[in-house]
Amino acid sequence: MEDAEPNLDILSSAADALAGHYARGTYNELASLLPAVVQSAHQHVQALDGHERRRAHRLRADILVSAGRWLIQVREHDLALMALRDALTDALTADDPVFAAAVVPVQSWALLRQARFDEVEKLCERTADKVEPTKLSKATPDELGAWGHLLLWASAAAARNNRPEEAADYLRAAAAAAARLGRETEVTGRRPFGPLTVAMKEVENILISGRPDRALQLAEQLPQDVGLTYSLAVHRHRIDVAKSQVLLGDAEAATGTLAELRSTVPGWLRHQQSAREVAEDILAARTRMPSAEQRDLADFLGVPA
């Protein structure tokens, strides 16, 4: 891509390829493509002008978001924040405020990994106030998704900061946005948003509050037939289910839940610290020798058996 003439359609396809690898958890492939695609994006921005340059900025923002997400997964949080800062600048330069708003939750993810809970809540609340639709009934799906995801991350930060009432308030507002969509919809930022996304965040918040029994009850009552069966959000939710299971003393069920994820998204699961913590809990909960499956799972996740 480095020596080719500018071609925004090819660059767009490359951005799609990066996002696809991220969504499938094929991180080695993403990492091998990323340097050339980022370099090509820089060259496109430098070589083009006018409308085409704005489009190049928008595509580079998309590419940098994929880079930022991958860097978070491999725990390079400072580098991720640098990439996401540049993505936000590109989105604003491209005059795409909805995409700019969609970058903020990804920034928030990196900040949460650094336990910067107050900062995340304030950032998301402030940005949500700026992009809140005047009337939900007239908002586009992308506008609802951008606003809703900001509220979900504000809720996540509040829940982790021992502010359950505020977390619930943010979640209720996000649920109102999701209700307008009625079903899961892919929105700007290559993420789904809808009733299931909000319901899974509620399970996460309840688990964080120390109520694994209630978390499992809610997990069994998730909205059905709303258009989303496979996404990283669903996989992340299944780790919450496994965590709830082991906390309630059902190490066998938790093992089965993680084993299903290993079968479905092994590359993604291997990078999940939360999955490693569940595996540690499974081993600690055993009153006898761990099973072969549990030892194998622990080895896969890098947990001493």
Protein language model regions, located:
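Conserved binding/catalytic microenvironments
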Residues: 2-305
